[in-house]
């Protein structure tokens, strides 16, 4: 390989090819903006220092999405360890720094209070926040999100049991643009339920205040259009609060809400004129049959 007389081309074999190292920063940013975040991590950032620095540009770091990465791997109990959380925290803080406060979307799992508070204090334009499976995120950092990120329009706090109904009040009061809320819980253990990868002691902290959360949602989050509350413990009374308060709902996911009947759902949602899709609980779950051997029957003993 030889460089051809200062013409910005590299001679390889029998042909001449552009010398990509000569591209201006503006050209690099234009090219890299067409790649996903993960594509930049495994490609351009490894080519040269110049390309890596371009990938650090704030305009390329307004969205931090690890959700697709998590989905590409099977669930692991190791994700629930402090060591793994430290790695996720470090990653989030580095992206916050690169964005220079310009982050608008965060989709992450297994972060902690430390990195989320760091993001809340530096990213006032945050609009989308997914923090699923974050046992060490509590009301303290969610209060910072509510106070510092008033433009929040989409929030996913599924399976994060350290976040209580108190956060829903604070977020509802401060984030008037909130349109999407996902507060899904993990299925409780049972023979017909999917396998759950999580520490048993964490599963025991399952939130049991479904009606309280439902009343708060109906009172403070009246602009919601999309609501997911899978496996909530709410009853017909709680669903009534949600439907009366959130009259603009277009989508509801009530899977696993075993305290609701078909009649409860039909009655309470009948007034939601904009509702286009509702996912209901399974009203006919499979029943585990226990076979008890009869004394004296050799085929069953």
UniProtKB/Swiss-Prot annotation:
LRR repeats lie at residues 108-133, 134-159, 160-185, 231-256, 257-282. Residues 18-66 form the F-box domain. Keywords: Leucine-rich repeat, Repeat. SMART domains: LRR_CC. PANTHER family: F-BOX AND LEUCINE-RICH REPEAT PROTEIN 6 (PTHR38926:SF5), F-BOX DOMAIN CONTAINING PROTEIN, EXPRESSED (PTHR38926). This is Putative F-box/LRR-repeat protein 19. It comes from Arabidopsis thaliana.
